[in-house]
């Protein structure tokens, strides 16, 4: 039987796990990044150009870490960020990425030429408001591109508790961590992507 979690339950479970085991969030972020890169490899040839979209929170940190791993594996990682990292683990992974020679930049009007895959690491399950402004424009750009998109934990714009969505990133695949998030099974969630746990 498939166990599902609400965003609040997942946050509590993760905090409890870290408190009981002493495993830091940075290690969980690295594990998440490995899973994301495995998914990217199902959609993009080895060594190809991949666009990583990173938000300010830990979802963005997963994206920075995945971009670093893709780069270390010989791929071309292009990173667009929406704001500065707001958590210590995300900041650390952004710094580690720059040490690999990748400089994150603001979102552009056009996708990078030759982009084989896009990673949506903008917002995680905690986002409850609709995407707007630059993020909504970015979703429209990516959705219209025909380039396969891998979502990190949940497609940005999808409510992780209800499955409600107005503007949302349409993913070819969503890599969700630890357990299925209830929003992926409700509302618009089931129509948005193939899901791997």
Identify the meaning behind each predicted range:
Residues 1-46:
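Positively charged, low-complexity intrinsically disordered leader regions
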Residues 22, 27, 34, 94, ...:
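General N-terminal targeting signals
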Residues 1-8, 12-13, 17, 115-195:
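YjeF_N-associated NAD(P)HX repair module
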């Amino acid at each position: 039987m498939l166990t599902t979690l609400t965003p609040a339950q997942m946050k509590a479970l993760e905090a409890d796990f870290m408190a009981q085991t002493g495993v830091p969030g940075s290690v969980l972020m690295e594990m998440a990044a490995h899973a994301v890169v495995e998914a990217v490899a199902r959609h993009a040839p080895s060594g190809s150009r991949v666009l990583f979209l990173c938000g300010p929170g830990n979802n963005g940190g997963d994206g920075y870490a995945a971009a670093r791993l893709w780069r270390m594996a010989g791929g071309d990682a292009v990173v667009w960020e929406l704001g500065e990292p707001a958590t210590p683990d995300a900041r650390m992974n952004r710094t580690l990425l720059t040490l690999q020679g990748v400089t994150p930049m603001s979102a552009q009007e056009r996708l990078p030429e030759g982009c084989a895959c896009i990673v949506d690491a903008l917002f995680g399950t905690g986002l409850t408001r609709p995407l707007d402004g630059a993020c909504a424009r970015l979703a429209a750009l990516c959705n219209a591109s025909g380039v396969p998109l891998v979502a990190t934990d949940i497609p940005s714009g999808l409510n992780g508790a209800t499955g409600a969505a107005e503007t949302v990133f349409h993913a070819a695949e969503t890599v969700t961590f630890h357990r299925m998030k209830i929003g992926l099974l409700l509302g618009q969630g089931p129509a948005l992507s193939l899901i791997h746990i």
